[in-house]
From Swiss-Prot:
One cellular component term from this protein's GO annotations in UniProt: cytoplasm
Native organism taxonomy: Bacteria, Thermotogati, Deinococcota, Deinococci, Deinococcales
Pathway terms, separated by semicolons: Sulfur metabolism; hydrogen sulfide biosynthesis; sulfite from sulfate
Localisation per UniProt entry: Cytoplasm
Protein name: Adenosine 5'-phosphosulfate reductase
InterPro entries referenced in this protein's UniProt entry, alphabetically: PAPS/APS_Rdtase, PAPS_reduct_dom, Rossmann-like_a/b/a_fold
Gene: cysH
Record family assignment: Belongs to the PAPS reductase family. CysH subfamily.
Organism from which the protein derives: Deinococcus radiodurans (strain ATCC 13939 / DSM 20539 / JCM 16871 / CCUG 27074 / LMG 4051 / NBRC 15346 / NCIMB 9279 / VKM B-1422 / R1)
Molecular-function GO terms, alphabetical: 4 iron, 4 sulfur cluster binding; adenylyl-sulfate reductase (thioredoxin) activity; metal ion binding; phosphoadenylyl-sulfate reductase (thioredoxin) activity
One Pfam family in the UniProt entry: PAPS_reduct
UniProt: [4Fe-4S] cluster binding residues: C137, C138, C220, C223
Length: 255
């Protein structure tokens, strides 16, 4: 059974604790087809539908702009579940600080960090694997830990922050993806970067400060650069590696 760092929404905060996560039995959920959501549908309505259809809904997040906006909308819509983050050992300090700021802002949510305390020297992967085989590095440090956790927890659906304008590889993302081990619900599928930025500014959300330095999509520091004018938001990820996705949402091992 995986050990995860869990930040619980106790009265007044409470210390950081490390405890084994027991598998939860997935509650029954409505096996209903998704409604015909459209570009003008309020994302909170999509989240409320997802909560009704999937009471065991779970939200992975890397706390990029999309993720921060979705987290705020989800809290408004009544989501009170887990926000699961994978510490690869290569995250920017600003990303970890953003996680901590979000945890303080949303005490009603439970923040779970998998691989807590990971570092480049922890022996999980060979040195510089990110350069020689980025797919293998992502699989070992990001995809596999989350896959194992989801297998233990057994959610029937995931709440995800991807949007169509992030990259050409995401241009056809639907609000609800079927197939695979579980549904993926994408309430922000039709939101533009301008909408996300406006919402974050209006609600004074704790956006990763690297975003304002041109890092429009932020992953691990060895494989992330600032985006150039006119590039997709995800163009700074694995630049020059012929790779556009970490493997969580596309490919044979997708969630």
């Amino acid at each position: 059974m995986m050990t995860a760092e869990v930040r619980t929404p106790e009265q007044g905060g409470g210390p950081l604790t490390t405890e084994p996560r027991a598998p939860r039995s997935a509650p029954g959920h409505a096996d209903a087809s998704a409604p015909a959501f459209g570009p003008e549908t309020d994302p909170r309505d999509i989240i409320r539908w997802a909560l009704a259809a999937h009471p065991d809904l779970l939200m992975p997040s890397a706390f990029n702009l999309n993720g921060v906006v979705l987290l705020d909308l989800a809290a408004q819509a009544g989501y009170r579940g887990e926000v699961v983050f994978v510490d690869t050992g290569y995250h920017f300090p600003e990303t970890l600080a953003t996680r901590d700021r979000l945890e303080s802002r949303y005490p009603e949510l439970t923040f779970v960090t998998l691989n807590a305390g990971a570092s480049p020297d922890d022996g999980q992967t060979p040195p510089d694997l990110y350069a020689s085989d980025p797919d293998a590095c992502c699989a070992a440090r990001k995809v596999d830990p989350l896959q194992r956790y989801l297998k233990e927890q057994g959610p029937s659906a995931l709440l995800n922050a991807r949007s169509r304008d992030q990259a050409s590889t995401r241009a056809d993302i639907p609000f609800v993806e079927e197939g695979g081990a579980r549904r993926r619900v994408n309430p922000l599928a039709h939101w533009t970067r301008e909408q996300l930025e406006a919402y974050a500014a209006e609600h004074d959300l704790p956006v990763n400060p690297l975003y304002f330095d041109g890092f429009l999509s932020i992953g691990c520091w060895p494989c992330t650069r600032a985006v150039k004018p006119g590039e997709d938001a995800r163009a700074g990820r694995w630049a020059g590696k012929g790779k556009t996705e970490c493997g969580l949402w596309q490919g044979e091992n997708k969630l």
